[in-house]
């Protein structure tokens, strides 16, 4: 599955079921740009097992505030609508895969 862009208005419905890795990012963030290809690879690797979502914190401040996102990129793993893990800053693919695997 391709990466899905989510907003404040559709965030909750997108995380309700299954495992989701949400990338809280912004267009001006260098490390956010660096992690983008890693997330694209993960989206392919985890197709059918977990979904990768992206939320622009500048355009969607309510959701970012709700989950206390202070630094970006912040990646939060949700399982059936509940946050179960959080990673802040650029991470290599192997680290993110390890985090996802814990919740599958």
Swiss-Prot record:
Keyword Transport: yes
GO MF terms held by the record: protein-disulfide reductase activity
Domain Thioredoxin, first and last residues per copy: 2-104
Keywords (A to Z) from UniProt: Disulfide bond, Electron transport, Redox-active center, Transport
The UniProt record lists the keyword Transmembrane helix: no
GO process annotations (BP): cell redox homeostasis
One cellular component (GO) term of this entry: cytosol
Pfam families: Thioredoxin
Disulfide bridge map: 29-32
Family to which the UniProt record says this protein belongs: Belongs to the thioredoxin family.
NCBIfam families: thioredoxin
PANTHER family: GEO12009P1
Function: Component of the thioredoxin-thioredoxin reductase system. Participates in various redox reactions through the reversible oxidation of its active center dithiol to a disulfide and catalyzes dithiol-disulfide exchange reactions.
Record's protein name: Thioredoxin
Organism listed in the record: Staphylococcus haemolyticus (strain JCSC1435)
């Amino acid at each position: 599955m391709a990466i899905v862009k989510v907003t404040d208005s559709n965030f909750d419905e997108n995380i309700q079921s299954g495992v989701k890795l949400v990338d809280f990012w912004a267009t001006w963030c260098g490390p956010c740009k660096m992690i983008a290809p890693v997330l694209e690879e993960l989206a392919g690797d985890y197709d059918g097992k977990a979904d990768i979502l992206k939320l622009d914190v500048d355009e969607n401040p309510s959701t970012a505030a709700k989950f206390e996102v202070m630094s970006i990129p912040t990646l939060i793993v949700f399982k059936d609508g509940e946050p179960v893990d959080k990673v802040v800053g650029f991470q290599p693919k192997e680290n993110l895969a390890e985090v996802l695997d814990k919740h599958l």
